[in-house]
Amino acid sequence: ITQYFKFISNNMCCGIKEMIMSLQVQGLSYAHPNKDILFQNISFSISSGEKCAIIGNNGIGKSTLLKIISGLIAPASGSVSCDYTPYMIPQHFGQFNDTTVGEALGVASKIHALSAILDGCGTVEDFTLLNDEWDIQERISDAFAHWEIDYVTPDMMMSSLSGGEKTKVFLAGLDIHHPSIVLMDEPTNHLDTKGRTLLYEFIHRTNNTIIVVSHDRTLLNMLSATYEMSPTGMRFYPMSYREYKETVDAAVAAKVARLQNQQKELAKAERLAHKTMERQQKHASRGEKQSAKQCVARIAMGNMRNRSEVSTSRLNKAQQEKLQDMHHELNEIRKSISESTTMKINIGNSNLPDRKRLVEVTDVKYRYDGRECLWQDAPLNLSIYSGERIWLQGDNGSGKSTLLKLVTGILRPTDGEIWRSYPLNILYFDQEYSCIDGERTVYGLLEACNTNKPEHELKMLLNRFQFPAPTWDKKCASLSGGERMKLALCRLLILDNVPDMIIADEPTNNIDISSMDILAETLKSYKGTLLIVSHDEQFVHDVGFERILRI
């Protein structure tokens, strides 16, 4: 943690920032402890004040790259050159469970030094440590108030805070430390609408160098540059994500047009080859008949036939090579298009009639052990009918996730009643897609569904869901968020059990943009009841909701 928040005070005091600053990454590679290569040959540079996004599929190594840049972990090879120590806003906070807020922010020692000095027992070390930051407590209070966590104090344990509150603690660190380079790993994952708005405002007004890993397209569209990361390198697009997407889509459209043209050319070449072969066969047949009538010497006839066969063989070989080249090019185009297009999944439709009452919530309250009662002053009352598409909104801590668990039956209300239609088939997705058993292998999970489908059919389905043969023996615990989502939908198809209602709690939090597009398209085409919590407005727009429920 000390290394994590090792700031050079003369770089960060009073928000003063030198104009000459850059970040250079050269030939960076990283391998897992088992020697499997995650990425290699990553090189790029970022100039002072640039605001950029790093995008790429789940599991490509974006978060690992940020950790290397921040100095948290070392690369297998390559180098990082940075004019200032970067400030990192992490995606996960487990490493801070046993620390206080002040320790996590790297200000606890300064607070203690200031207290000792004010108490009249300060040492030379205390004055050195404080470094003339006499206003450190005021800066902390102002920063916490700005990010709407004024009730948080530096001596509180990080483990006592929610995910959104932890994110806001690190965002408050921006106002406390005034770093010149900021690294953000999925900063909006746990933020409610108000928190996201504050972050967007910071991105808009700051002159700092910002490097963001995110699937929040609103945030990505605020950045002026996009770096596309792959296992073999980094590709730079001097544009926002929206413009990048338009560029990529145009390239895919050009590939589709090229594919269609290539298919026509291939068909034309195959027809020509077929006609040429027919012509040669007819010519050879006529030659044999004519030779027989004219009693051509047997040896002369043999020479003619040999010359004809050699000529035909050469022609056939040239045509075959041309056709093989065209087939190869066609397959390469198809592959590149397949990698760039959204996978289509149809999970079927509910058979329930529209407007059938499915759930009735009456005067419900809920209390977690040791915490205040949710909805104490305004108990929840609501009805859910079949065919409704409901977007559940609310600030952090308002009880959205709790309500979803109450509706599914995972939790029981402390007060009040919840009635459900019977039978009611509910599919519940939490943020981690916990319906996927992490101890099973990818293939073993489908096999455990106890269906009558043969092995080859299960493996064909896995291939369709972008799980090739090398992934079948992987433990599900090692899958990325997007892979877990696709496997959950694949499992749903295997069970052949279309849900009456799909309930999802921030289902896009841990998946990449391509997986978000797949999920949005799947839910958009689903004809049934939806109850979803999401702060991603683009995802909500893509899915399409008819009712907004705010708690």
Q: Which sequence ranges carry the predicted segments?
A:
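Conserved beta-strand
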Residues: V25-L28, I37-S47, G78, V361-K365, ...
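ABC ATPase nucleotide-binding domain signature region
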Residues: K51, T64-E125, E228-P231, S386-D395, ...
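Conserved D-loop/post-Walker B switch-helix segment of ABC ATPase nucleotide-binding domains
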Residues: D192-E201, N509-E521, Q538
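GG-anchored amphipathic helix commonly corresponding to the ABC/SMC/Rad50 NBD signature/C-loop
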Residues: G164-L183, E483-I503
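Catalytic Walker B motif of ABC-type/P-loop ATPase nucleotide-binding domains
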Residues: V182-E186, L191, F429, M501-E506
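Coupling and communication elements adjacent to P-loop NTPase active sites across diverse families
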Residues: M19-A31, K110-T167, T247-G370
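ABC-family P-loop ATPase nucleotide-binding domains
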Residues: Q95-S160, D430-R491, L495-D500
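Pre-Walker A (P-loop) beta-loop-beta motif of ABC nucleotide-binding domains
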Residues: I42-A53, N207-N208, P379-W391, G528
